[in-house]
């Protein structure tokens, strides 16, 4: 499709939506829009590697394509409607909160944006001046990223559960695996093996403690996104009565 569009002379801009994780970032970093040169062994999952591969292929093979690569960070919920448009990924935070333990530190940051902010940013990229052959993060950045401690406290407030930050424990994946048989008691009916696989996958990403720099996006006039903790209560309200196992099916069909 991209090859065909590169031959359309009237085409002014071609937006490819990838993922911020396609650069395979190192831990504890502020990640700027990097070169398209990551290697397969740097990627934990095929998804991010495939995104990185197509970005590089379009850039190298289609020089006439008016390409802009947009890299959203973690898209969770809607700033006004909560999880009504999509509950993707939100269940991960509920899972951690319910367990009271996970493989990340409470002070680790996570770069989350609402889906409406992501959509508005993509529309802005279609017409922004001076944006061509660029890689641009759509992300929370330094000012709007939040820590897991802040998320934990916001979930406690939104759910009305009496729990303290001190209740949380950082554990290893091995320790999570050892508690696999208790998952049904904690989460209700669920596929314990799928649940554990999800913990392994998202545990890796959550432990990276990375923030994706959004200076480029702000420079073309985008506003700062709402913090995840500012609309998290709406995500809780819109998923009330739905089990974590049911929410997982959005991402693990």
Segments (PLM) and residue ranges:
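Active-site beta-alpha turn of Rossmann-fold NAD(P)-dependent dehydrogenases/reductases
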Residues: 15-18, 62, 71-73, 139
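Secondary-structure transition/capping motifs at alpha-helix termini
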Residues: 2-12, 60-66, 128-130, 158-163
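Active-site loop of classical SDR/Rossmann-like NAD(P)-dependent oxidoreductases
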Residues: 201-215
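Conserved catalytic Lys-bearing alpha helix of Rossmann-like short-chain dehydrogenase/reductases
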Residues: 1, 50-58, 92
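Conserved Rossmann-fold NAD(P)-dependent oxidoreductase catalytic core, especially the SDR/UDP-sugar
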Residues: 1-46, 68, 77
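NAD(P)-dependent short-chain dehydrogenase/reductase
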Residues: 29-30, 59-111, 115-128, 154-158
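Short-chain dehydrogenase/reductase
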Residues: 33, 40-52, 108-112, 145
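Mid/C-terminal beta-alpha module of Rossmann-like enzyme folds, strongest
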Residues: 124-200, 219, 235, 242-252
């Amino acid at each position: 499709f991209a090859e065909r569009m590169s031959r359309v002379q009237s085409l002014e801009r071609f937006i490819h939506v990838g993922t911020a994780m396609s650069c395979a970032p190192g831990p504890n970093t502020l990640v700027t829009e990097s070169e398209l040169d990551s290697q397969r062994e740097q990627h934990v999952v095929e998804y991010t590697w495939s995104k990185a591969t197509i970005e590089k292929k379009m850039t190298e093979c289609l020089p006439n394509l008016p390409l802009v690569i947009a890299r959203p960070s973690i898209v969770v919920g809607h700033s006004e409607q909560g999880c009504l448009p999509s509950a993707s990924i939100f269940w991960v935070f509920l899972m951690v909160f319910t367990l009271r333990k996970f493989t990340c530190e409470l002070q680790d940051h996570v770069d989350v944006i609402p889906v409406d902010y992501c959509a508005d940013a993509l529309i802005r990229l279609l017409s922004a001046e001076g944006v061509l052959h660029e890689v641009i993060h759509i992300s929370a950045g330094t000012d709007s990223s939040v820590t897991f401690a802040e998320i934990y406290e916001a979930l406690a407030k939104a759910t009305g559960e009496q729990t303290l930050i001190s209740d949380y424990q950082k554990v290893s994946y091995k320790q999570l695996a050892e508690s696999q048989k208790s998952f049904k008691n904690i989460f209700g009916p669920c596929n314990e093996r799928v649940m554990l696989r999800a913990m392994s996958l998202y545990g890796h990403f959550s432990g990276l403690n990375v923030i994706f720099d959004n200076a480029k996006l702000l420079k073309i006039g985008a506003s700062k996104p709402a913090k995840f903790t500012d609309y998290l209560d709406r995500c809780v309200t819109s998923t009330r009565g739905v089990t974590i196992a049911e929410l997982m099916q959005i991402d693990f069909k």
